Amino acid sequence: MQNMPKKRYMLTIKIIYCNMENIKHYFAGINSKDGFVNNFNNINTTKNGITYILKGGPGTGKSTLMKKVGMFFATRGEQVDFFHCSSDVNSLDGIFLPTHGVAIVDGTAPHIIEATMPAIKENLINLGEYINQNVQKNSKKVEKLLENKKKHYNMAYMFLKCAGTLFDANEQLGDADTKETTENLLQSLDLKTSKQYKKRELFLTAVDTKIISLLSKNKYSKILCLNLSQKANHIVFAELANYAEKNNISHTLLKEVLNTSFIEAIEFNDINLLIYSCPTTLNKEALKNQKTINLLTFQAGSHIEKARKIHKKVEKIYIKHTNFDKITQITEDLIFLIQKQKAS
């Protein structure tokens, strides 16, 4: 990274970031019936912000770097958004610092990100530069591990495709009557036009051996549970989103994991309110389908878990051959640079 400052920080931050009021947790990409769905372009919504794109192999410290930078600013009371890896919730794919208009993202597969305007909108940081070339003696082993990892992801996507088909079937079985729910909600919420309108599309849930939700990690002023049918909930969310967009009300759409064209929840950012889908049904066929969906997502999650374990093995190989002293220096330099950057 060019023009690195000489000033250093001693990073002794303990990385515990759950349930802090100034931190929000999301997924920017998820494993779905359509493969990996990538909404990383929704991380940094600042007009003149900058995004640092991390490159480098597994085990080179990308997630740890982001955790340390994020916690440095979070422990100073600043708002920080953490974007978790949908295949390993304990790992990060990105962070966003709205006060500074800065994002740091993992730009490696499956969410490959390249600079569109280098040194203007994005800066590339290649942590792969600090991998010792002795790692090459493990080339065949790494290649075989990556092949097996890919097979498990392909299996996971097959199960998710089946689960998504049944999810869509339940959409057709649901009652579409919203009974003026949207109008009543809008009257009770009294939403105001935002001074700086922003819209994002992200995810709050992902598939593992069970459906993982980040809902409990976030602190909201209020959470409303929408308990109409699956179909009716989606209609209400679409109407709320349309109203928010037309009236320049900042909001975050949190999409469904089994069909990302539908909305699972909507967050109204200015008042820190979340409206979340808790669908109910008495339809016997829909209930039966849901049981099958649960089995299919479990099967998908079991393959994602196997892929994650393989990924950990690959990480261990690279960890042995990575110079983390250099990466610590980069982390400290980034903090120094970000402190001077203010969102415009």
Indicate residue ranges for each PLM-predicted region.
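Short, Lys/Arg-enriched N-terminal segments with co-localized hydrophobic residues
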Residues: K6-N19
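Hydrophobic, helix-prone linear segments
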Residues: C18-M71, T75-N90
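N-terminal pre-Walker A segment at the start of P-loop NTPase domains
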Residues: M20-F40, S188-S213
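Conserved nucleotide-sensing/catalytic segment adjacent to the nucleotide-binding pocket
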Residues: H25-A28, A74-N132, E245-S302
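Phosphate-binding P-loop
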Residues: N42-N48, L214-S221
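Glycine-rich phosphate-binding P-loop
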Residues: Y52-V69, S221-A244
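A cross-family "folded-core" feature that marks the main globular domain of proteins
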Residues: L54-K55, L65-M66, F73, D81-S86, ...
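An accessory alpha-helical subdomain
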Residues: K141-K192, A300-Q341
